[in-house]
Amino acid sequence: MSSRSELLLDRFAEKIGIGSISFNENRLCSFAIDEIYYISLSDANDEYMMIYGVCGKFPTDNPNFALEILNANLWFAENGGPYLCYESGAQSLLLALRFPLDDATPEKLENEIEVVVKSMENLYLVLHNQGITLENEHMKIEEISSSDNKYYYAGR
């Protein structure tokens, strides 16, 4: 029997016009948007799904980076998420958003993925404007509409 997340993922794939996507044996489903934004969905449990945006490698050469990330995380928390987290296996910074499955639709999932993508763009630009670059072979500053972003926003 399929989980609620699997059923939603099937309907989401149909809505956006791709053949089929599914969760792997680790209950993760990863895909790229415009070959720039890497998103992973986690079938965490039957109550919610997690949406992760892969931002890039954690730069260890900038002493202010950790403090800036804490500042950004507070701002995101005050404005409805997503939250910043660290994935030790890939040594990468992620944006994570909890997506409740009650009353979930493909449209709602798409909207919340868009929140994560816009938050990734904003985070990347604010950090870039402070001289901090996340190592990410896919997300290039030239590919994101450039601006003078100095403040974080949650993409909502």
From Swiss-Prot:
It comes from Escherichia coli. SUPFAM superfamilies: Type III secretory system chaperone-like (SSF69635). Keywords: Chaperone, Cytoplasm, Virulence. Coiled coil: none annotated. Chaperone for the type III secretion of Tir. Probably stabilizes the protein, prevents inappropriate protein-protein interactions and aids in secretion. One of its GO terms (cellular component) is cytoplasm. Pfam families: CesT. GO terms for biological process: protein secretion by the type III secretion system. Belongs to the CesT/SycH chaperone family. Its main location: cytoplasm. CDD domains: T3SC_IA_CesT-like. This is Tir chaperone. Signal peptide: none annotated. It is found in: Cytoplasm. The keyword Coiled coil does not apply.
